[in-house]
């Protein structure tokens, strides 16, 4: 499986260094865990509070910034055979929110970002925690298993 990663860092912080190789490892671990084997493309945009707030309001009608948003690709079925790699979609991650949540939850910023990346990739693959309690439990279970493979503790444990 080949992963093409587009990384746009509109907001950066010395507290959270993002390395392309590490991001690809997290994405690949997530994809392999759920049995995904195709070449794919994923975009990640790291944004500030203002942009996160604007996007969250525009797409989710929530008037506040959020940690992460996922935008699954909407490629027509008939186009897929013409593509070398399947565009899975884009993730927008708000670095200031990630840093604040990590502090509040007593986690490292790297581990919290990794969790949100796993969570977002699962959304791009069609997993959804807002449709039912069962779906939420399935998604959380997958996140815990994937993060364990990356030597990251269960993010839902107090």
Swiss-Prot record:
GO biological process: rRNA processing
UniProt: Zn(2+) binding residues: 119, 123, 129
First-listed, main subcellular location of the protein, grouped into a coarse class: cytoplasm
Gene Ontology cellular component annotations, sorted alphabetically: cytoplasm
UniProt entry tagged with the keyword Glycoprotein: no
Gene3D superfamilies xrefs: Metalloproteases ('zincins'), catalytic domain
InterPro entries found in the cross-reference section: MetalPrtase_cat_dom_sf_prd, YbeY, YbeY_CS
Membrane spanning stretches: none
Cofactor note: Binds 1 zinc ion.
CC cofactor: Zn(2+)
A Pfam entry, by short name: YbeY
GO molecular function, one term: RNA endonuclease activity
Keywords recorded for this protein, A-Z: Cytoplasm, Endonuclease, Hydrolase, Metal-binding, Nuclease, Ribosome biogenesis, rRNA processing, Zinc
EC number(s) from the headed UniProt entry: 3.1.-.-
Subcellular location: Cytoplasm
Stored NCBIfam families: rRNA maturation RNase YbeY
Entry function: Single strand-specific metallo-endoribonuclease involved in late-stage 70S ribosome quality control and in maturation of the 3' terminus of the 16S rRNA.
Family: Belongs to the endoribonuclease YbeY family.
Protein name: Endoribonuclease YbeY
Organism for this UniProt entry: Acinetobacter baumannii (strain SDF)
Gene that this polypeptide is encoded by: ybeY
């Amino acid at each position: 499986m080949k992963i093409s990663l587009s990384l746009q860092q509109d907001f950066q912080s010395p507290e959270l260094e993002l390395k392309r190789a590490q991001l690809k490892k997290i994405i690949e671990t997530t994809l392999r865990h759920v049995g995904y084997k195709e070449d794919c493309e994923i975009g990640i945009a790291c944004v500030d509070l203002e942009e996160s707030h604007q996007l969250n309001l525009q797409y989710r009608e929530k008037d506040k910034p959020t940690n992460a948003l996922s935008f699954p690709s909407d490629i027509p079925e008939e186009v897929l055979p013409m593509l070398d790699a399947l565009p899975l979609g884009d993730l927008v991650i708000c670095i200031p929110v990630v840093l604040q949540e990590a502090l509040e939850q007593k986690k490292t910023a790297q581990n919290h970002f990794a969790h949100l990346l796993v969570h977002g990739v699962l959304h791009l693959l069609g997993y959804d925690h807002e449709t039912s309690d069962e779906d939420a439990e399935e998604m959380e279970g997958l996140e815990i298993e994937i993060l364990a493979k990356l030597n990251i503790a269960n993010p839902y444990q107090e």
